[in-house]
Amino acid sequence: MTSLTPSALSSSHALVVFSGGQDSTTCLGWAIKHFKSVEAITFDYGQRHRIEIEQSRLIAQKLGIKQFILEFDLFSKLGDSALLETSSDLKASPHRTKPHLPASFVPNRNALFFTLAHAYAQREGLTHIITGISEADYSGYPDCREEFITHLERTLNLGSDSSILFAYPLLHRNKAQTFALAKECGVLDLVLEESHTCYNGDRSHRYEWGYGCKECPACGLREKGWREYQASL
C-alpha cells in the first residue's frame, strides 16, 4: 500500500470505492482522516437489494461526501453469481461454475469496478483510490488479494499513462480490527447504524453489531468480528 506521509497527504485527493457496507464505510472514515479531500464512487450493477445503494447515499450525505453513482447492468447479462439472483441461497453454497469459490462471487467484479474508478479518478484529478479489500477474513475471492490489486494498479496506470495509487487499509485487518479502525476514525456508530452488509437485505432486525438476518455468511462474519472486537476492549 502507498506510504501515506503528512507532506504527501497535504495535496492528495482520494476516491473511495464505496458500497455502503462495513468495510467501505470504514474506508471512507479512514480516507477522511488521512486525505485533503475525499469523494466516493458507488456502483449500481443489479445487485440483489436496493438497500445497499440507499444506505450508501445516506452515509455519504451524513459525512458530507460527494458521491458519484454509476449505473450499469452488465453482470446480470453475463450472469454467474447468486449475489445477482434474489431466489438463490447464499448461506453456504458453492459457486455454480466455480465450486471452489462461494456462490456470492461475481467474476471480474472488482476488476471492472477498479477500472471504472480509475477512469473517474483521472477525470476528477484524484490521486488515490481507496478500496476495502481484505485477505484477513478471506472469503475465497481471488480479486481481494494483494497480488491482484498491485498488478491491476500497474496495468491501469500503464494503459492510461497515469500514476494513480491504490490504498487498501483493511488488507491485513480482520473484522474485529476493522471495527477498531472504524472507532479510531470516528465512524463506528455510523457503521453500526447505517452500513449494510447482509446478503439477504434485512434491515428489520437490529443486533449489537448492526442490522441483518444473522444467517448469511456476511452477517456471520460481521457478528463474529464484533464479538472479537468487544472481547479485545
Swiss-Prot record:
- Protein name per its UniProtKB record: 7-cyano-7-deazaguanine synthase
Q: Which domain of life is it from?
A: Bacteria
Cofactor names from the entry are: Zn(2+)
Source organism lineage? Bacteria, Pseudomonadati, Campylobacterota, Epsilonproteobacteria, Campylobacterales
Molecular-function GO term, any one? ligase activity, forming carbon-nitrogen bonds
Name the job this protein performs: Catalyzes the ATP-dependent conversion of 7-carboxy-7-deazaguanine (CDG) to 7-cyano-7-deazaguanine (preQ(0)).
The family database entries (InterPro entries) matched by this protein are listed as: QueC (IPR018317), Rossmann-like_a/b/a_fold (IPR014729)
Name the EC number(s). Answer: 6.3.4.20
* Record field: catalytic activity: 7-carboxy-7-deazaguanine + NH4(+) + ATP = 7-cyano-7-deazaguanine + ADP + phosphate + H2O + H(+)
Q: Where does ATP bind?
A: 18-28
Does this entry carry the keyword Ribosomal protein? Answer: no
Which family is it part of? Belongs to the QueC family.
The leader peptide range reads none
Name of the gene encoding the protein in the UniProt record = queC
- Please give the pathway this protein is involved in: Purine metabolism; 7-cyano-7-deazaguanine biosynthesis
